[in-house]
A protein has these predicted regions:
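Acyl-donor (CoA/ACP) binding surface of acyl/acetyltransferases
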Residues: 1-29, 33-43, 76-194
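Conserved GNAT-fold acetyl-CoA-binding loop/helix
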Residues: 42-63
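A short helix-loop-beta-strand connector motif used in the catalytic cores of GNAT acetyltransferases and
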Residues: 50-51, 62-78
């Protein structure tokens, strides 16, 4: 595995799968990804405004996301096929908190045509490795809807453990949805500076 990451940018390569921080120049590709997967992702995501599917909407969003990257408060990453540059999915870390929590939440999406090939399992493994080893976090939290067996399988493969069940947890596609709550703990966590 090749790793050229820094404290403000993710860049990890596993075979032909590249995990990297989204940049301003990615607005076209990201808008195209969400347009192409709009119906497929709809049951798993919040209702989106039209700007979410537009290049201009993503230009504005990426400016804000890049500021969060620079401040160490959030990371929005893309899963890309390195040989072709094709975008396969997204992995985002939000609600980043340092002392005393050292934790964050993770969310992700994968293109319909990329399902069933292990891309998200590999990508999420690389992404969590970055958050633990570069960002020095102790805990990463993820939630999934009980009927989303693919997400359950990905999280289990990466090592997330079930912690609870939250009723009406997130507003997904206009409906409050229950979620199973999971976490991944960094077993090698050390205080910064050690």
């Amino acid at each position: 595995m090749e790793d050229n990451s820094s404290s403000i940018a993710v860049h990890k390569l596993d075979g032909d799968l590249l995990l990297r921080t989204a940049e301003i120049g990615d607005a076209d590709m990201i808008a195209e990804y969400f347009q192409a997967n709009r119906e497929y992702l709809k049951p798993f995501e919040p209702k989106r405004e039209e700007a979410f599917f537009s290049v201009n909407g993503w230009l504005q969003k990426l400016i804000k996301l890049n500021e969060l990257h620079r401040m160490g408060l959030g990371y929005y990453c893309l899963l890309v096929r390195a040989s072709s540059g094709e975008m396969l999915g997204t992995i985002s870390f939000s609600s980043l908190s340092r002392f005393p929590f050292y934790s964050c939440n993770v969310g992700y999406s994968l293109a319909e045509k990329a399902q069933g090939h292990g891309y998200m399992r590999r990508g999420l493994t690389m992404a969590c490795d970055y958050m633990f080893n570069v960002q020095k976090l102790h805990r990463i939290q993820a939630g999934y809807m009980p009927h989303n067996k693919r997400s359950e399988s990905v999280l289990e493969h990466v090592g997330f453990n079930r912690e609870g069940y939250a009723k009406d947890y997130l507003l997904i596609n206009g409906e409050w949805q229950d979620h199973i709550l999971t976490s991944l703990i960094n077993p090698n966590w050390q205080p910064e500076g050690r």
